[in-house]
């Protein structure tokens, strides 16, 4: 359990309400991991909402390892997250950079796999994710960052589905910190 400031404890409650309202569905779904699930979480309706992104960004910023100098994530789910966190950090006088990791390296121009400012080697970067199931997307992001000589210690996610992602990241010496787990949605007797 994460210990947040009093303000962010309220932010967390408000974020859960928004996620339940806009992001959570019951039914039969195939997830990005290929797994079948009776529960679907698409955080984009919340991360692409001004209030939702503000709540996520404040919580992530408080949760993030203070040694991190940048945030990064795999496009598309992480795009609003990295932007929101660096903007929130700047509003508090903290300077962070953001990197967006392409799913496929560009085949033209600079053939970049990462988009963003040029950072020094061994910069500590925190990976941001919306939902972690098996951590496949996060591991892809971590590998790309490590190939570029960055240090990754942690992944922050909005939701951990508790389907092996934590353990998979641990095998890569990465800590997973999540705002919520799937149990938070199940315990709230969501009727969607």
Curated annotation (Swiss-Prot):
Identify the metabolic or biological route this protein is part of: Pyrimidine metabolism; UMP biosynthesis via de novo pathway; UMP from orotate: step 1/2
State the SUPFAM superfamilies in the record.
PRTase-like
Cofactor dependence is on: Mg(2+)
- Give start-end ranges for the coiled-coil region(s): none
Per the record, what are the reactions this protein catalyses?
orotidine 5'-phosphate + diphosphate = orotate + 5-phospho-alpha-D-ribose 1-diphosphate
Gene Ontology BP, a term:
'de novo' UMP biosynthetic process
Reported EC number(s) for this entry are: 2.4.2.10
Query: Cross-referenced InterPro entries, in alphabetical order?
Result: OPRT, Or_phspho_trans_dom, PRibTrfase_dom, PRTase-like
CDD domains, per this entry? PRTases_typeI
Tell me the residue numbers annotated for binding orotate. Answer: 133, 161
Q: Where does 5-phospho-alpha-D-ribose 1-diphosphate bind?
A: 102-103, 106, 129-137
Q: Does the keyword Amino-acid biosynthesis apply?
A: no
Stated family: Belongs to the purine/pyrimidine phosphoribosyltransferase family. PyrE subfamily.
Summary of the function given for this chain in its UniProt record: Catalyzes the transfer of a ribosyl phosphate group from 5-phosphoribose 1-diphosphate to orotate, leading to the formation of orotidine monophosphate (OMP).
Q: Which PANTHER family match?
A: OROTATE PHOSPHORIBOSYLTRANSFERASE, URIDINE 5'-MONOPHOSPHATE SYNTHASE
Quaternary state and partners of this protein? Homodimer.
Q: Indicate what this protein is called per its UniProt record.
A: Orotate phosphoribosyltransferase
What species is given as this protein's source? Prochlorococcus marinus (strain MIT 9515)
